[in-house]
């Protein structure tokens, strides 16, 4: 079945599985980058505790780079899918070309931060000179060679928008394999390669990302034939850029808020380096679970957006129903794994003094996964139906308005010696349940105003 016909005619439940599985694997492998780095770094011969703390502190900036790349890609994805659904191939070519122009601008900003801003950022979260040195070295490499992750994110969304998510997953798998192979070689020093410690982890990560980006560039040029490829379409078009970010900016802010949340949580937990490290480790496991929901969301959005472009009320409703159902199934599996095996995750990271904090955090925070996954699915639905503001509000509730004040208040009692650090972890499930209730109300309103009103 041709790709455009598949998006139009294939039953939605089957289409979502076919598109969703590669995307889920792709997002899971993206989370593996950070988990693999932490696992290998945690087993370094010396300085592993400081190195794990350094990776915790650099994580918000890594997330921010991904946020801007993926958010721009999300806007491109939804707009391109809708444009193709309307049969406008010329505009589709401009959408794809402008997304690549935006990618170049994003890389220049990351490059400048990598050269001039990294050390000041790390120093704001710790006074330990070893952690500052390790964090600065790692993050500078990731920023200066960030073009891999930025352009991978864009090409991934361009392929997903045309229903070719399998190829984006192939690129992700190849990059992940390269990263995993290089990690022990560059971190520990094997054969002619010298021992580089955290620098080696950074080099392994960015090389894997560059390989993925190059492979997806080839797939994009050879397979996305629904529209023309030409550098003339990279000429900035204000109207198209505005449309991309009308959809994608809330996604960027949503992802950026995750970075802000992690950064502020690091500051809140600054009183206990072990708790700070534990938070960084469990957050990577949490992201691994939630990235399953993000992957499915990336199938939900183009399916519903394409259906919205062709005014198919039934396919939109099917997309919403199956998207939420499949998300809940994935999150139940995630809760089961994290509740049953927290000790095994701690052993993987060689968590040391942070072990008990890590296990306690996992058992409490995993309660929130089902509600968090539903919130992610809601946001994918909103983005497909021009509900960017609703998506932004859910992100603000989850990443800023509720969780940070709660965690700050709870930390006041913890620092006063009235109760253990575990109180802070309860801010996560409270936040997700509250946001989920608000998200349901938004979904009802969007369904009434956008879907039921279709002719």
Segment roles from a protein language model:
Residues 7-39, 43-47, 60-75, 79, ...:
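N-terminal transmembrane alpha-helices
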Residues 49-60, 135, 139, 273-288, ...:
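Small-residue hotspots at the loop-to-helix junctions and early N-terminal turns
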Residues 52-112, 149-168, 278-342, 372-386, ...:
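Small-residue-rich hydrophobic transmembrane alpha-helices
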Residues 23, 27, 39, 78, ...:
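Transmembrane alpha-helix boundary and packing residues in multipass membrane permease domains
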Residues 28, 32-53, 122-129, 185-196, ...:
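Helix-terminus/linker motif at the lipid-water interface of multi-pass membrane proteins
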Residues 73, 142-160, 168-176, 201-216, ...:
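Short runs within selected transmembrane alpha-helices of multi-pass transporters and secretion channels
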